[in-house]
């Protein structure tokens, strides 16, 4: 539930880093002294000094080249990735629609996944029962809803994940590229549903390489480049700056 704070998401001085194995030669002495200890690791910053505030009801596009950090930023907003430092404040119920299949249990059927994920979203058994048929109908999976998810194509996983994520009006909807998978008809259906969610006052954060799609959905953009925020502003201006990166 939304409180009286005037923002949906606020990030203050956020850094995110990953630890990777060092490259290059390692001396025999270093190897011997490291036995039984943590392997040699390099600290690689993926995001640095991120400051961003998104207000309730805003529709924001995250734009940037591959590897810029925009998808990592979306995962930070969803709570999947913890920052190395900094503060993250989220004011509302978040529905993340990120990488294909994330959150789905592959050994379970589609219908079993509906029950599981709806329960994890905080729904009561009565709500789950009421929403299940609506989810199945929106997904257009038909009899495949009784298959194990490991038999699904990527498009079928997208249908199921999206249908579950949007069944209840979220306060904040996070979308990362996944709507580009599957047939055009279902993509249009999903975008129409996102527009309906937006019209009811939800905050939308959208990552896509399709600028026309982004422009129709979002009025504001954030340009992410080399792990930092280069620019925040009107979507047209952000789009122009984005195009100059290539």
What are the functions of these language-model segments?
Residues 1-46, 236-245:
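Pre-NBD coupling/linker segments of ABC/ABC-like ATPases
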Residues 208-209:
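H-loop/switch region of ABC-family ATPase nucleotide-binding domains
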């Amino acid at each position: 539930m939304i409180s009286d704070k005037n923002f949906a998401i606020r990030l203050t001085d956020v850094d995110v880093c990953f630890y990777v194995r060092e490259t290059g030669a390692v001396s025999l002495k270093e190897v011997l002294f490291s036995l039984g200890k943590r392997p040699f690791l390099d600290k690689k910053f993926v995001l640095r000094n991120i400051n961003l505030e998104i207000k309730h009801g805003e529709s924001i596009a995250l734009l940037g080249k591959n590897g810029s950090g925009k998808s990592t930023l979306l995962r930070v907003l969803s709570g999947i990735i913890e920052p190395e430092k900094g503060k993250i404040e989220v004011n509302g119920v978040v529905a993340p629609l990120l990488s294909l299949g994330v959150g789905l249990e592959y050994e379970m059927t589609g219908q079993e996944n509906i029950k599981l994920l709806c329960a994890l979203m905080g729904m009561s058994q009565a709500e789950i029962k009421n929403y299940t048929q609506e989810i199945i109908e929106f997904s257009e999976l038909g009899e495949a809803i009784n298959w194990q998810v490991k038999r699904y194509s990527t498009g079928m996983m997208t249908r199921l994940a999206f249908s579950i994520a949007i069944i209840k009006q979220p306060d904040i909807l996070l979308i990362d590229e996944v709507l580009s998978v599957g047939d055009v008809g279902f993509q249009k259906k999903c975008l129409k549903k996102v527009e309906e969610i937006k019209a009811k006052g939800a905050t939308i954060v959208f990552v896509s390489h399709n600028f026309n799609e982004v422009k129709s959905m979002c009025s504001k953009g954030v340009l992410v480049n080399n792990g930092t925020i280069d620019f925040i502003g009107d979507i047209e201006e952000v789009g122009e700056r984005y195009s100059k990166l290539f």
